[in-house]
């Protein structure tokens, strides 16, 4: 079970200065990288392809951020929070370390 999943709200804690402290929703998790909506945008140069109907040009898209550079956002406290795991009745779940509340 991963500490950060798709749909979680996270805060960027390290990396480029323009991204630090920003908050966003996780769009995808791939290996050790997360893609966060609207954060860490890069310019990608796209070649035109008339067969697929793709226009060429410069396109903005989100790049991945290493999973160690983000922390889960706790809406109850309004701060970032660590994630722990517990097993109750044979079911493993995530919880916030500061409040002890269950995440999912």
From Swiss-Prot:
Coiled-coil ranges from the UniProt annotation: none
SUPFAM superfamilies in the cross-refs: Translation proteins SH3-like domain (SSF50104)
Signal peptide annotation: none
One Pfam family in the UniProt entry: ribosomal_L24
GO molecular function: rRNA binding; structural constituent of ribosome
BP GO annotations: translation
Keyword Ribosomal protein: yes
CDD domains on file: KOW_RPL26
GO CC terms of this entry: ribonucleoprotein complex; ribosome
Alphabetical keyword list: Ribonucleoprotein, Ribosomal protein, RNA-binding, rRNA-binding
Top-level taxon of origin: Bacteria
Record-stated family: Belongs to the universal ribosomal protein uL24 family.
Assembly and binders: Part of the 50S ribosomal subunit.
Record-linked NCBIfam families: rplX_bact
General function of this protein: One of two assembly initiator proteins, it binds directly to the 5'-end of the 23S rRNA, where it nucleates assembly of the 50S subunit. One of the proteins that surrounds the polypeptide exit tunnel on the outside of the subunit.
Protein name, entry field: Large ribosomal subunit protein uL24
Gene name per UniProt: rplX
